[in-house]
Structures are given as structure tokens and as C-alpha cells.
A protein has these predicted regions:
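FAD-binding beta-loop-beta segment adjacent to the flavin cofactor pocket
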Residues: 19-29, 112-127, 131, 172-188
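Short FAD-binding loop at a beta-strand-to-alpha-helix junction that anchors the flavin cofactor
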Residues: 130-142
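Central helical "cap/lid" subdomain
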Residues: 76, 80-122, 143, 149-156, ...
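A conserved short coil-to-beta-strand element within the FAD-binding core of flavoproteins
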Residues: 65-79
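Flavin (FAD/FMN) cofactor-binding core of flavoprotein oxidoreductases
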Residues: 3-13, 160-188
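A short, glycine/Asx- and small/polar-enriched loop/turn
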Residues: 16, 78-81, 185-188
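Flavin (FAD/FMN) cofactor-binding and adjacent substrate-gating region
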Residues: 1-60, 186
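Small-molecule pocket liners
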Residues: 5, 104-108, 127, 136
């Protein structure tokens, strides 16, 4: 469980999930960074995919499940009583779903713990710090229809500038890497 703060540029109703988590409170004005007018603090689980996915695979196999990675041209080719379709962007071809589009995400890895996560989830200013057990993930970008997989230095600068607005204690000398990934998205 980790604490996080989400900052907003307008006052809104608290989210429906507020009663479903361990802790939730509205921030006092002095806790809100410049440029924002409202926000909340919460305690919620953080799932670290590099740790969770191997555990999940092991769990499925220990319960008698099998995992198979292969090239599939049609879902009817796949045997099994239950098939979990995890093709992501591959749904464009496999499922003839032209609405699935890439959303390019670039993040930075930092060897500095902010203590809590910081979030601005608005699409035009998407910003986050996600503390994990080994690094803090800084983000981000969500560039729809961008298939580019190279790390772009100008995007790193944008991410760092946005994060510093939420977390002024950021130490740029603690950057240890970064990555780019493509998430499936759709316009609906």
C-alpha cells in the first residue's frame, strides 16, 4: 500500500472509489501545488508488474493452468475451455478491431523516493510519480496514434518539468533510465 495525492485544476466531487480504499481525505489548500485548486490524498495498492507478472504466471501454473505464447491468426485456432485474450494492440488484426490504437507512453526511472505518489490525471497535463520497491517511475505521456519506440529527450524534459511542478524536491541527478511502451487505447 502506498499513499498518493491527486491534484486537480477545478473543484470536483470526490471519486466514487473513495469509500473502497484504506484511506481518503481532501487536501488542505497549503498542500496543493501552484496551478491547482483541489485535490485528495489516498492509500491504495501499487502493483509492480515486473514482480507481479512472474508471480501470476507461477500461480496459474500451480493451479494447473498453462500459458502458451504463439502466433495466432484466428481466435478459433486456440484450444481450451477458457482463453484469456491479452493481445493488446494486436486486437487490430486478430479481432478486426480498427478502433484499437496505440497510446505511446514514455517514462523515466529515478533512484529517489518521493514518499508518496503525485498525480495529475488530466489528459493534457498527465503527470505522475509512482514509487516502487526499486525505483520511482516518473511520467508521462499518452500520445495516441504514435508508434514511435525511441526515448525522446524533449519528452524527458517535458516530463521532468511537469513532475517538478508537483514535486519540487526532484533530483535530476538521480535519473537511472527510462523506457517507452505502447498501450492499447480507443476513442470511445
Amino acid at each position: 500500500m502506498r499513499d498518493g495525492r491527486e491534484y486537480l485544476r477545478e473543484v470536483v466531487e470526490p471519486p466514487a472509489w473513495r469509500d473502497d480504499i484504506a484511506a481518503f481525505s481532501i487536501l488542505d489548500q497549503y498542500e496543493i501545488p501552484d496551478g491547482y485548486v483541489f485535490g485528495w490524498q489516498f492509500r491504495a495498492p501499487v502493483i509492480e508488474m515486473p514482480l507481479y507478472m512472474p508471480w501470476l504466471r507461477s500461480r496459474v501454473e500451480s493451479l494447473g493452468g498453462t500459458l502458451r505464447q504463439s502466433f495466432v491468426e484466428d481466435l478459433s485456432e486456440v484450444p481450451g475451455e477458457v482463453v484469456v485474450n491479452c493481445v493488446g494492440l494486436g486486437a487490430r488484426e486478430l479481432c478486426q478491431d480498427d478502433e484499437v490504437r496505440p497510446a505511446r507512453g514514455q517514462v523515466i526511472f529515478l533512484d529517489q523516493d518521493p514518499g508518496i505518489g503525485h498525480f495529475d490525471q488530466q489528459p493534457e497535463t498527465l503527470t505522475y510519480t509512482i514509487p516502487r520497491s526499486d525505483v520511482t517511475v516518473l511520467g508521462g505521456t499518452a500520445q495516441v496514434d504514435d508508434w514511435g519506440m525511441d526515448i525522446r529527450p524533449e519528452e524527458n524534459e517535458l516530463i521532468l518539468d511537469k513532475v517538478e511542478a508537483l514535486w519540487p524536491e526532484l533530483d535530476r541527478s538521480k535519473i537511472i533510465g527510462g523506457t517507452v511502451g505502447l498501450r492499447p487505447s480507443r476513442s470511445e
